[in-house]
Every structure is written in structure tokens, then in C-alpha cells.
């Protein structure tokens, strides 16, 4: 982009193209000062902002590979911590590819989660397990199965401790990967994300007769979490509370 359209480029000789109309697909670099087909949009009243306004004590935990997902991305593209927000980064293991260590740092993350539950000082924990996605990217089916088994074990411990603490657990994902390890057309290893529907599990021992509505979408998770906390969703949120209460 710089060589073709940014004045002052000097890394190597270039030819000025007077009849070139250069449009960036997205904003790759703000210093380019070029037209953008799909400029970034500001996200208003995301879940983290609502929590901050009423001081919901929330704790974000993940290992290195997914730390940005529970902080920067969860906050709508904002790096700075909000009020009443705590963060903990657990280092990912130093290996060439994660099929060499499918457990990654899942057990270390889980230890921190269990300790936080026992302390009882946090309203919401946001946790991301990297294993199914990061090991899934290697295309190694047997190691991806191991990765899922490790996370299943960790979720079992967390869910048990949450039930003992009379808390509510939501388990979901923002995309697929590990569920499709073989390309159905070529038969080759499938290493990319998928757009398959993802599961949503809501474990709440205190809700008798509660069911989840059909046809849910990712946009419904934030309104559901706010409803579980007894908070109103802002108008900017287009999703709905997924619970059906009898």
C-alpha cells in the first residue's frame, strides 16, 4: 500500500501512477490517509461499559493466546481497563506448535478461576480457554481431541465449584474450529475457523423451570448476562434475553 499510494515512500524505487484510485478495504493503518471502503465503527454501550457504569466487579482471565479476546476485544476495541475490572494473564507455553502440548495453560487458568470463586469477591468471571482453537489450527485430529478433553475436565471443575457457590455458569464460543478437522471436499486437514452454530450452556441451579429460547445468536449473550445480573440492556443492544422462565 505504501509503495503504491503513500507519498514519500523510499524503501525502493517506485513509479508514480497518476490514474490509480486506491481504496483500502478496512483501516489497516491510520497514517495512510487513504479512503476506506469499510471504516471502523465505534461500539457504544458494550457489555463491559454497562458493567463499569454500575460497578459490576468483573475479572478477566486467559492465557496469552486469548488474553486480548477477554480484554481489548471484549471491551469493544478499547485497551484501557474499565472501572471495577481486573485482569490476569497466564503465560502460554513456549512451544513451536500447540499440538506438542495440547493442555497449553488450561490447568493454570483453572487454578486461578477456582481460587477467585472461593474468594467470593467477584460478580462476574470472563474466562477463555484457548486449547480447542489453537490446537485445532494445527490440523492434528488426535491432539485436538486431547485439547478438548483437557478443557472438558477444567470446565467440569469450574462448573462444580460454581454450583457449590450458587453461581451461574455460561459456556459458549464465538466461532467453531475443533468440531471440523477434515475438509469435506478435499479430505485434507481443516485448520481454519468455521461458521457452524456454537453451543450455549447455561447452568443455574436457582432457576426452576428455566429453558433457553430457540434461534439464539451471539448478540443475545450480552442481554442474557445483563438479565441474569438484574440489569436492563441498553437500546444499542439488539439481542434478547435467551431465557424462558415459567
Q: Over which residues does each language-model region extend?
A:
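Feature captures the catalytic ectodomains and active-site-proximal regions of enzymes
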Residues: 1-246
Amino acid at each position: 500500500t505504501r509503495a503504491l499510494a503513500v507519498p514519500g515512500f523510499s524503501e525502493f524505487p517506485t513509479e508514480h501512477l497518476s490514474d490509480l484510485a486506491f481504496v483500502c478495504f478496512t483501516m489497516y493503518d491510520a497514517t495512510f490517509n487513504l479512503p476506506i471502503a469499510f471504516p471502523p465503527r465505534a461500539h457504544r454501550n458494550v457489555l463491559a461499559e454497562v458493567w463499569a457504569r454500575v460497578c459490576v466487579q468483573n475479572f478477566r482471565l486467559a492465557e496469552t493466546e486469548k488474553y486480548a479476546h477477554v480484554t481489548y476485544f471484549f471491551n469493544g476495541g478499547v485497551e484501557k481497563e474499565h472501572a471495577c475490572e481486573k485482569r490476569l494473564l497466564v503465560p502460554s507455553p513456549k512451544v513451536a506448535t500447540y499440538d506438542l502440548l495440547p493442555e497449553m495453560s488450561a490447568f493454570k487458568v483453572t487454578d486461578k478461576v477456582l481460587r477467585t470463586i472461593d474468594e467470593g469477591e467477584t460478580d462476574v468471571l470472563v474466562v477463555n480457554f484457548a486449547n480447542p482453537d489453537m490446537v485445532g489450527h494445527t490440523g492434528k485430529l488426535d491432539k485436538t481431541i486431547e485439547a478438548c478433553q483437557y478443557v472438558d475436565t477444567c470446565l467440569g471443575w469450574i462448573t462444580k465449584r460454581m454450583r457449590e457457590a450458587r453461581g451461574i455458569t455460561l459456556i459458549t464460543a464465538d466461532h467453531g474450529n475443533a468440531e471440523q478437522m477434515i475438509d469435506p471436499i478435499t479430505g485434507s486437514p481443516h485448520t481454519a475457523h468455521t461458521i457452524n452454530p456454537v453451543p450455549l450452556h447455561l447452568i443455574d441451579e436457582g432457576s426452576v423451570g428455566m429453558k433457553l429460547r430457540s434461534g439464539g445468536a451471539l448478540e443475545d449473550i450480552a442481554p442474557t448476562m445483563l438479565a441474569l445480573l438484574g440489569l436492563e440492556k441498553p437500546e444499542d443492544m439488539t439481542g434478547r434475553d435467551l431465557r424462558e422462565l415459567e
